[in-house]
């Protein structure tokens, strides 16, 4: 789980039941966790993606933190990604669909689930980019966003901070290589456990080469129908764009000299490290950052680049072998994972949370077969995160009744299947 803009995002695969202490949340969707109120059946959810390059590594060349401490402490810079605007989207069959505002035009999608009850339409990322993506700025130009944020006073402050020695506000966890043989001549890798970031901060390597993805429903999507990755750009010069590139969308900011650690060798009950991601709470880390007094510094802009990350889109199955997870297989004609039909009444006997549902499950309700594309997000992603109070208020029969009445012409009859 990570925290982005004050909201929690959990690994969709872990939510679906594939929880693992070694989950790196890479190549996967991070879905916004709902904690309050009763979610709408067709609710639009925010989501972000994390790629395989986003795992943090040790800040090898940085100054050592002063103070007595454990030998496992490393130094991870804190990055903030500021989006210029925000767009809403929905996950439909594992793919991102962008909500179209009034005034936009798009070809009507074939999938009826791309329509909302109020008449709004969704289109795929690819279709959106083809029609509405802004042109990338020419080489050597300064983007409007960076111009606005780069006043003379900010430039002076940034120059002063770059010339100052790096400051660390930690009374603990000095990196002692003599006490840590594993670090001799090598760079320790950060643990593979999931790492959260405090109050909208995003972690990265010290060189800022690996940055977590922009909010998956970014306002100006710049990836193909798979994923979005942030790569750093200069604040004053932008590389010559390729035909598939789009304009930079976000500014990347950081607290210079302030680091958090993804490793710690202290005992769980007696860790004094104020910048420890393992033993400090969100509130403590946020307080540590604020009390440092170090202002945010703009270190450049992030541009969306094309990377195949969505494991649902990157299917490598063949006619002879299917390597999809049993619950997520969408391969046509797959002999390993066949379509199964379950009666709606099964929920009353086993409960919603106990019924085994897959992408190929069809729920028989009122003489109709309801494919997973109509209920997957709600039953598999939203319901498991509901509180006991929310579950008590949930009328699953009424929910399915409304779904079938809305989409009846597009559902198969159970008697003819």
Curated annotation (Swiss-Prot):
Can you list the GO cellular component terms from the UniProt entry?
nucleus
Q: Where in the cell is it found?
A: Nucleus
Molecular function (Gene Ontology), one example: RNA polymerase II cis-regulatory region sequence-specific DNA binding
Q: Principal place where this protein is found?
A: nucleus
Under which name does UniProt file this protein? Metal-binding activator 1
Give the free-text miscellaneous remark of the entry. Present with 14800 molecules/cell in log phase SD medium.
Q: Give the gene symbol.
A: MAC1
**Source taxonomy lineage?**
Eukaryota, Fungi, Dikarya, Ascomycota, Saccharomycotina
Spans annotated as Disordered = 128-198, 216-242
Q: What spans are recorded as compositionally biased (Basic and acidic residues)?
A: 153-178
Q: Which SMART domains match?
A: Copper-fist, Cu_FIST
Repeat (sequence) residue spans along the chain: 264-279, 322-337
Annotated residues for binding of Zn(2+): 11, 14, 23, 25
Segments of skewed composition (Polar residues)? 179-190, 228-238
Answer yes or no on keyword Nucleus.
yes
Q: Which organism is it from?
A: Saccharomyces cerevisiae (strain ATCC 204508 / S288c)
Q: InterPro entries from the xrefs?
A: Copper_Homeo_Regul, Cu_fist_DNA-bd_dom, Cu_fist_DNA-bd_dom_sf
Region (2 X 16 AA repeat of C-X-C-X(4)-C-X-C-X-X-C-X-X-H) residue spans:
264-337
